[in-house]
């Protein structure tokens, strides 16, 4: 298996006294003030950030709040720092993800459903893939797993890497793999391009399907790109398969733009979710509980 990574994207005493007078990070500051009216986001090209920006517009109390662009690693770093100090933080989160196993977290209620509800993750393939590689197509079409399976791979990858974690999952679930490959003739080194996105959820699914296909005689390459490029690659035939589309909300705009140019094989996972997430120690339960910026 090959893995291709693309590039995307002194102080005077009087000053100390003044800083002390203006510092709101004390027991009298509200949660919103301690947060600096800011929600921690991830990569700007993700569907999650588009929904998060819409949410700030949908809720009048959030109209003047800030949504910071970062990376998933950067967001997780901020979460870890805040959690260790029991400080408030609001961030864009989703599951399946190992963060929910490592930290005690909760979703803020979203009465307007601006961030969607339960999501599915679908499998799409380029037109002609079934005719060109019918055996691989059958395996890819049969691939379906549960959120707990994905989280297992994601968690194991924290102590190793996704290739090793995927191989471990495949080995431990040989009966399931046997069902997916039953009656399917082995490949002869045919190359299969897997287009993924740069997040742990898709790292997990892409590496697992790659491990299964490799085990069955195919040669795979995984390329992580932004969601817009992922849909474009499959639609133009520059990639063979993707297990990355989140539907019906997160990637809806990309899906609608290209839906006539690829084949949708349906869900490979049901029960995914995204939203605004906080540590369980924070005394807040809903987006509507947040005070507007003064």
Q: Model-derived features: where do they sit?
A:
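C-terminal motif of bacterial Sec signal peptides marking the signal peptidase cleavage site
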Residues: 16-20
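Bacterial signal peptide processing site
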Residues: 22-24
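A conserved helix-loop-strand patch within extracytoplasmic ligand-binding domains
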Residues: 26-40, 126-130, 137-138, 144-147, ...
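Short, well-ordered beta-strand elements
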Residues: 29, 33-41, 140, 188-201, ...
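Short helix-initiation/N-cap motifs at beta->coil->alpha
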Residues: 67-78, 199-200, 221-233
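Periplasmic-binding protein-like
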Residues: 73, 100-141, 267-275
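Short, glycine-/small- and polar/acidic-enriched structural segments
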Residues: 204-218, 222-286
């Amino acid at each position: 298996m090959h893995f291709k990574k693309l590039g995307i994207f002194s102080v005077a005493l009087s000053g100390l006294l003044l800083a002390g007078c203006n510092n709101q990070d004390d027991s009298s500051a509200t949660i919103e003030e301690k947060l600096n009216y800011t929600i921690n986001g991830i990569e700007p090209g993700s569907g999650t950030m588009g929904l998060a920006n819409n949410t700030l517009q949908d809720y009048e109390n959030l109209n003047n709040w800030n949504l910071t662009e970062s990376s998933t690693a950067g967001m997780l770093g901020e979460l870890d720092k805040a959690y260790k100090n029991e400080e408030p933080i609001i961030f864009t989160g989703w599951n399946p993800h190992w963060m929910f196993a490592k930290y005690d977290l909760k979703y803020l209620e979203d009465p307007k459903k601006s961030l969607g509800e339960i999501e599915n993750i679908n499998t799409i393939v380029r037109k002609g893939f079934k005719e060109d590689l019918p055996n691989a197509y059958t395996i890819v079409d049969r691939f379906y797993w549960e959120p707990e399976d994905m989280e297992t791979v994601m968690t194991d990858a924290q102590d190793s890497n996704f290739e090793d974690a995927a191989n471990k999952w495949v080995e431990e679930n040989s009966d399931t793999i046997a069902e997916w490959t039953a009656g399917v003739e082995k490949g002869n080194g045919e190359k299969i391009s897997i287009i993924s996105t740069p997040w742990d959820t898709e790292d997990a699914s892409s590496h697992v399907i790659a491990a299964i296909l490799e085990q069955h005689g195919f040669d795979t390459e995984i390329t992580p790109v932004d969601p817009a490029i992922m849909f474009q690659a499959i639609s133009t035939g520059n990639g063979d398969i993707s297990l990355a589309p989140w539907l019906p909300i997160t990637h809806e705009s990309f899906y609608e733009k290209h839906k006539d140019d690829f084949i949708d094989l349906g869900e490979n996972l049901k029960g995914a979710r995204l939203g605004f997430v906080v540590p369980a120690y924070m005394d807040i339960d809903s987006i509507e509980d947040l005070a507007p910026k003064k």
